[in-house]
Swiss-Prot record:
Function: Catalyzes the dehydration of D-arabinonate to 2-keto-3-deoxy-D-arabinonate. Participates in a pentose oxidation pathway that converts D-arabinonate to 2-oxoglutarate.
Induction entry: Expression is strongly increased by growth on D-arabinose, both at the mRNA and at the protein level.
Organism whose genome encodes this protein: Saccharolobus solfataricus (strain ATCC 35092 / DSM 1617 / JCM 11322 / P2) (Sulfolobus solfataricus)
Protein name: Arabinonate dehydratase
Binding site for Mg(2+): D199, E225, E251
Keywords: Carbohydrate metabolism, Lyase, Magnesium, Metal-binding
Pfam families linked to this entry: MR_MLE_C, MR_MLE_N
EC number: 4.2.1.5
């Protein structure tokens, strides 16, 4: 039985000098900020989840504490599907996407953590998976006043030296010509055997995305992520049809219903989603299985804390995803939240075989990284 639900708003300020196109354009500039959810059962099990809503963590926290928590107290924590539906239906009139789903995401992941701990099995095995390693690509190439072309080349060369065979670079904040020069400089240093993807973070118009896509085709780019605003699915479908470079997205979509429309309209070639805001592990599994039926690869997105990274990893292992996204820029909410170190082996993330998520929250970490406001 669910005894208590606690939430913690956590902040890390150390990555503000590296920015994507949205931040450069003044549309989304926030510190790394997550909401961690802690669920305790009457028989002493504790599970953890993570939610992300840039700049809106207070609203996520209130949603969990004031709306979701009263629905869940004294419920059977093992009835995860029932509890997901109960939360979704209770927030239907004002939720369905965004903040409410981000809150549900953290709760759902925490419930799966508990389920694994009670069963003494890792989550990926509860989901039917067998994959012990998932190949990772590294997202970098953020814009920074401190990063000239030479430093950009050094950064990407470092990722390859560590054994990663795929990288992703931020674009969209500079002119197309400047971004193409950045990509050419990276290709020179990483060679032809490393996959290079790009991420525009939704900043282009359709016409701009089409023009940039034509340029990216000539460079052999692996995929073009979130070229335009997520809402313009018909236009994204036109891009996917007209461009040779695969369109990837849209991590900013929520739940199986929105992803059904994305796939039905063939708005992407590669599906990307994330446990921290699409509805948790339960919903991401539904999206992943739907992608299999409709012929799409699913590559999990990642950009926040350690709990969501490991949640994504378990789902990727269960779905046999070909890749998973990873970051290596300094982020204490990823690197210092667990007692154990996240295991990387020759460019792959190792799926933990310990119960639940398989990682232990470090004592005092929620107090240490508690947001100041």
């Amino acid at each position: 039985m669910i005894k208590d639900i606690r939430t913690y708003k956590l902040c890390y300020e150390g990555i503000n000098d590296e920015r994507d196109a949205l931040a450069i354009k003044g549309l989304a500039e926030h510190p790394m900020e997550i909401v961690a959810t802690e669920i305790e059962t009457s028989d002493g099990y504790v599970g953890y989840g993570e939610s992300l809503a840039y700049g809106c963590s207070d609203a996520v926290q209130v949603t969990i504490e004031k709306i979701l928590k009263p629905l869940l107290l004294k419920e059977d924590e093992e009835l995860i599907e029932y509890l997901w539906d109960k939360m979704y239906k209770a927030t239907l009139r004002f939720g369905r996407r965004g903040i409410a789903i981000a809150g549900i995401s953290g709760v759902d992941t925490a419930l799966w953590d508990i389920m694994g701990k009670k069963a003494k099995k890792p989550i990926y095995k509860l989901l039917g998976g067998s994959k012990r390693k998932v190949r990772a690509y590294i997202t970098g190439g953020y814009y920074s006043e401190k990063k000239d072309l030479e430093k950009l080349r050094d950064e990407e060369a470092y990722y390859v030296k560590m054994g990663f065979k795929g990288i992703k670079v931020k674009i969209g904040a500079k002119s197309m010509e400047e971004d193409i020069e950045r990509l050419k400089a990276i290709r020179e240093v990483v060679g032809e055997d490393v996959k290079i993807a790009v991420d525009a973070n939704n900043v282009y118009t359709f016409e701009e995305a089409l023009e940039m896509g034509r340029r990216l085709e000539k460079l052999g780019i692996w995929f073009f992520e979130e070229p335009i605003q997520t809402d313009y699915l018909d236009l994204s479908a036109r891009l996917a049809e007209e461009l040779e470079v695969p369109i990837a997205g849209y991590e900013t979509a929520y739940t199986r219903w929105e992803f059904y429309e994305i796939m039905r309209k063939r708005a992407v070639d590669i599906v990307q989603t994330d446990v921290m805001w699409t509805g948790g592990i339960s919903e991401m599994m539904k999206i992943g299985n739907m992608a299999k039926v409709m012929g799409y690869p699913l590559i999990p997105h990642y950009s926040a804390g350690g709990i969501s990274l490991i949640g994504n990893l378990h789902v990727a292992a269960a779905l046999n995803s070909p890749w998973i996204e990873m970051h290596l820029r300094k982020n204490d909410l990823r690197d210092k939240i667990f007692k154990e170190s996240i295991e990387i082996d020759n460019g792959h993330l190792v799926v933990p075989d310990r119960p639940g998520l398989g990682y232990t929250i470090r004592d005092g970490v929620f107090e240490e990284y508690k947001c100041k406001s």
